[in-house]
C-alpha cells in the first residue's frame, strides 16, 4: 500500500484571502496519478481547510482520508484509522462539489467594482445542491466506516403536535458489519408547503450511536420549535406555519433511509401584513385575508368563467393562457382595477373596504 499525504500549499489556501479554485496543484495531481498507476492500493490523506476537486484522480486511488487541519496528535489519529485500530465515524460538514462552476456563489464571486453580492441567499451548501439537483462528489453529512449500518422502525412521539411542544424522532440502528463502530444519524425536515421560499430540506437534528457487531440501539432525536421555524422578513421574527412536514432520517443529506410524515399546528398569532400591494394569492393564503376576500374572489371567479364561456377550463381555452395564475399574482389594487367592470363599487373603494375588514379581525 502507498500512502500519499497531500496538503494544500500556502499559495493555494491560507487565511486572509479567498481561494481562486478548488484544485490541488498540477504537481500534486501528477504525483497521485503516477503513484496510483504503480500501486493501485494508494491512499490519499488530505490536509486542507475546505473542499478540493478530485475528479481528475479519485478513480485512480483506493481510498481518501480527509484529515482537514489537524492538531499535534493528528498523525497518531491518522495512523490509528489507516491500521484499523480505530473505526472512522466522521461525517462531512460541507459538500464536496465536482467542480468550481457547480458551487452556489460561482456567478457572484469575486464580484465587481469591489463589491460581492451574496446572491445565494438561503441556498448555501447542500440546500443549493438539493434544490438545483446538481450532482456532487461527496454530499454533506457523508462519511465511510469499516462497518455498515441499517436503519429501521422510524417513529415519532406524536404524528400531530403544536410547535411549542415539539416532537421526538426515534429510529433503530443496527451494526450489520463485523467491526464495532459509531454512526451519526441525521434528521432533515422538509416543509411540504411554505409561505416563503425554503430549501427542499434542512438538517435539524443528529445523534451519534456506538454499536458492536450485530447490536441494535434506538436513537432518539428531539425537534423543537426552531426545527420547524423560518425567519419571516415582514414579521421580523422566526415563525412557524401550520401544515405537513416530512422528517427524513439518513446517513447523509442524500442517503435518506427512513421518513415519517407529521402535522404541525402553529400557536403563533401574527399581525396581518396585507395591503393593497399584496397579491391576490397572498390574500387568499392569509387566514384573515381568506375570510374577507374569499367570497369576493369566488364571485369574481364565477363571473369571469361565465364571461369567457363557462366551464372549469373555459377561461384558459378562451384566452390561450393560464388566466388565473396571472390574476392571482397581481396586486390587490391592480387586480380590482383590471376587473372593475364586474365590481359593484369603484376598485379603490373596494380595496379600502377589504383592508378595513381584514385589519378589524386582528
Where does each model-flagged region fall?
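C-terminal non-catalytic regions of proteins with extracellular/luminal or membrane-system context
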Residues: 1-362
Amino acid at each position: 500500500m502507498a500512502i500519499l499525504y497531500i496538503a494544500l500549499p500556502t499559495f493555494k489556501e491560507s487565511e486572509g484571502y479567498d481561494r481562486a479554485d478548488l484544485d490541488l496543484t498540477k504537481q500534486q495531481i501528477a504525483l497521485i496519478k503516477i503513484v496510483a498507476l504503480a500501486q493501485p492500493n494508494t491512499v490519499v490523506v488530505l490536509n486542507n481547510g475546505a473542499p478540493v476537486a478530485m475528479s481528475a484522480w479519485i478513480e485512480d486511488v483506493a481510498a481518501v482520508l480527509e484529515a482537514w487541519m489537524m492538531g499535534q496528535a493528528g498523525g497518531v489519529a491518522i495512523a490509528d484509522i489507516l491500521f484499523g485500530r480505530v473505526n472512522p465515524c466522521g461525517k462531512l460538514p460541507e459538500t464536496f462539489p465536482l467542480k468550481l462552476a457547480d458551487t452556489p456563489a460561482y456567478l457572484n464571486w469575486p464580484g465587481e467594482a469591489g463589491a460581492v453580492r451574496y446572491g445565494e441567499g438561503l441556498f448555501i451548501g447542500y440546500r443549493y445542491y438539493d434544490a438545483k439537483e446538481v450532482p456532487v462528489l461527496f454530499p454533506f453529512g457523508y462519511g465511510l466506516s469499516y462497518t455498515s449500518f441499517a436503519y429501521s422502525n422510524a417513529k415519532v412521539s406524536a404524528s400531530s403536535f403544536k410547535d411549542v411542544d415539539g416532537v421526538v424522532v426515534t429510529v433503530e440502528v443496527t451494526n450489520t458489519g463485523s467491526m464495532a463502530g459509531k454512526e451519526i444519524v441525521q434528521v432533515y425536515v422538509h416543509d411540504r408547503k411554505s409561505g416563503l421560499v425554503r430549501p427542499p430540506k434542512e438538517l435539524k437534528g443528529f445523534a451519534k450511536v456506538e454499536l458492536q457487531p450485530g447490536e441494535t440501539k434506538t436513537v432518539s432525536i428531539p425537534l423543537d420549535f426552531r426545527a420547524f421555524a423560518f425567519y419571516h422578513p415582514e414579521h421580523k421574527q422566526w415563525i412557524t406555519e401550520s401544515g405537513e412536514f416530512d422528517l427524513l432520517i439518513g446517513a447523509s443529506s442524500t442517503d435518506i433511509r427512513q421518513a415519517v410524515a407529521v402535522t404541525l399546528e402553529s400557536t403563533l398569532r401574527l399581525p396581518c401584513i396585507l395591503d393593497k400591494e399584496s397579491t391576490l394569492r397572498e390574500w387568499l393564503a392569509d387566514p384573515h385575508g381568506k375570510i374577507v376576500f374569499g367570497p369576493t374572489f369566488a364571485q369574481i371567479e364565477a363571473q369571469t368563467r361565465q364571461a369567457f364561456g363557462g366551464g372549469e377550463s373555459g377561461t384558459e381555452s378562451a384566452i390561450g393562457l393560464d388566466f388565473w395564475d396571472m390574476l392571482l399574482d397581481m396586486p390587490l389594487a391592480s387586480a380590482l382595477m383590471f376587473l372593475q367592470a364586474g365590481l359593484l363599487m369603484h376598485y379603490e373603494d373596494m380595496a379600502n373596504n377589504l383592508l378595513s375588514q381584514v385589519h378589524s379581525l386582528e
